[in-house]
Regions:
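An aromatic- and histidine-rich active-site surface loop
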Residues: 80-115
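N-terminal subdomain of nucleotide-sugar transferases
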Residues: 1-43, 48-51
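A short, basic/aromatic alpha-helical/loop segment that forms part
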Residues: 14, 173-175, 195-200, 213-214
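A short, charged, and often flexible helix/loop element on the N-terminal side
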Residues: 45-76, 80-89, 119-126
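Membrane-proximal helix-turn-helix segments that form the acceptor-binding/catalytic region
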Residues: 100, 113, 126-144
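Acidic anion/phosphate-binding donor-loop and adjacent secondary structure
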Residues: 156, 168-185
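Carbohydrate-associated surface elements
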Residues: 40, 150, 170
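Conserved donor-binding/catalytic core segment of Leloir-type glycosyltransferases
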Residues: 2-4, 145, 180-209, 219-220
Length: 224
């Protein structure tokens, strides 16, 4: 089986989606022929067991992006195209180009269709994007991939596409160095972007409730 992933960036600074495609590409590449279409950046992550193709950035006034992606589709002839990310015209156009060739498309929004995201810049950015390309992209995808049950339920509430599968994110355990010392320390680590969406409010509330039991513990919050 031949699979093409499209993702806007695999740069180290791009966050969780870059790490996701790095882990996925390494393991999926052992089972299928995997190609990744993306855009050049200063610090791209290395991804094993797959071929990376850099294309021009999307520009509605130029045709280089469309020409390059179409050429890759013609040469590679994939069985499946997997689009990662949304709210970017390039993602929708990759999907359109694939489906014009009757190639099945999986669409993974990576949490970018959560209610709180949609509400941000709703009238100035989200509504125009939905009307121009994003709504049709969601409706026409052969399958939507959610990473958790809560995300699936929010996608169902949108009412655009009910064919949703949950595929949870994995980690590359081989790259994790084991601790040499297991000395117990009274320390809790919250490692994430500092935002209510990441559940930091639950940690704060729980710590307050368990204040007496947590005497002597240190809570470390690390993230943007």
């Amino acid at each position: 089986m031949k699979i093409i992933h499209y993702i806007p960036s695999i740069d180290r600074t791009a966050g969780g989606t870059s790490t996701y495609i790095q882990v996925l590409g390494k393991e999926l590449g052992k089972l299928a022929e995997v190609h990744i279409i993306t855009h050049a950046s200063e610090n791209p992550l290395p991804i094993d067991n797959c071929k990376i193709h850099y294309v021009s950035g999307y520009n509605p006034l130029k045709g280089s992006f469309k020409i390059e992606v179409n050429k890759l589709f013609d040469v590679l002839k994939p069985d499946l195209v997997h689009v990662n990310c949304c709210w970017m015209p390039a993602c929708a156009f990759v999907q359109q180009m694939a489906q014009k060739r009757n190639i099945k498309v999986v669409f993974t929004p990576h949490g970018m269709l959560e209610p709180w995201i949609i509400k941000r810049h709703y009238w100035t950015r989200k509504v125009p994007a939905l009307l121009l390309y994003q709504k049709s992209a969601i409706k026409n995808a052969d399958c939507l991939q959610a990473t958790a049950e809560s995300e699936k339920q929010n996608l169902l509430k949108l009412g655009y596409n009910s064919n949703i599968k949950i595929v949870k994110l994995g980690i590359d355990a081989e790259s994790i160095a084991m601790k040499t010392s297991w000395k117990k320390s009274k320390q809790m680590l919250f490692l994430s972007r500092v935002h209510i969406k990441k559940g930091i409010n639950y940690l704060i509330e729980a710590a307050d409730i368990l204040r007496d039991e947590l005497q002597g513990y240190k809570i470390v919050v690390a993230g943007e």
